Amino acid sequence: MSESFDCAKCNESLYGRKYIQTDSGPYCVPCYDNTFANTCAECQQLIGHDSRELFYEDRHFHEGCFRCCRCQRSLADEPFTCQDSELLCNDCYCSAFSSQCSACGETVMPGSRKLEYGGQTWHEHCFLCSGCEQPLGSRSFVPDKGAHYCVPCYENKFAPRCARCSKTLTQGGVTYRDQPWHRECLVCTGCQTPLAGQQFTSRDEDPYCVACFGELFAPKCSSCKRPIVGLGGGKYVSFEDRHWHHNCFSCARCSTSLVGQGFVPDGDQVLCQGCSQAGP
């Protein structure tokens, strides 16, 4: 009598039948599929032992069921993306979920490096400075009327320029004759002393500190010989081609102030009427 050779599950004889051997014993094909086969996540049917099985994460598929949920294209040996548990080929994913580059108009592919600003998207290599046309990458930039500039290009194009050196002013300038200047560029034409923050005047559009202007251009007091400068409310008296500070315009003999008083010239001197009448 021959030894029994039965299916480990249904106990039906396997003589003359196709079977599959496992560590737990032999199985007829139907029992093997019912016991060990995975269920296809798409069609919910068993994936038989003679079917090609594909799996993604914890889901299993017949080869014919592993396809794009939109265009039904097979994803076997094709790149794909999972979106909300649905499988999509790259073309459908890009069409449905990817954005277009605002510069070149091409699709920004999933996983590629991109930049987003103001509701727009760019390929990293397409986000360029509108001035030098170099990629901005992670550098600081300044938006202006739909354009984007790196900081050096923006300053070079839009920042005010110093009236003296013509270089851009990026911070802390001063205004002279309605033009911007670097603080260090606004200096006295005579002594080169910085003028920012102090009183100064000008001649022929050139700026001068008070001291240089007085020495170079101001009339000299006929009494003390020092320059007469009008800054700060200074007052002076003129007679013919001579000038005096208010506090210097006094009688040469008695030192009485002659401001607003009658006086008599006496050579290089001026006298009050009393001293003039008194004689030499």
From Swiss-Prot:
GO terms for cellular component: focal adhesion; nucleus; stress fiber; Z disc. The modification N-acetylserine is found at residue 2. GO terms for molecular function: actin binding; transcription coregulator activity; zinc ion binding. Pfam families: LIM (PF00412), LIM_FHL2-3_N (PF25076). Residues 40-92, 101-153, 162-212, 221-275 form the LIM zinc-binding domain. Expressed only in skeletal muscle. The modification N6-acetyllysine is found at residues 157, 235. It comes from the Eukaryota. It is found in: Nucleus; Cytoplasm. InterPro entries: LIM_FHL1/2/3/5_N (IPR056807), Znf_LIM (IPR001781). Recruited by SOX15 to FOXK1 promoters where it acts as a transcriptional coactivator of FOXK1. Interacts with SOX15; the interaction recruits FHL3 to FOXK1 promoters where it acts as a transcriptional coactivator of FOXK1. This is Four and a half LIM domains protein 3. The lineage of its organism: Eukaryota, Metazoa, Chordata, Craniata, Vertebrata.
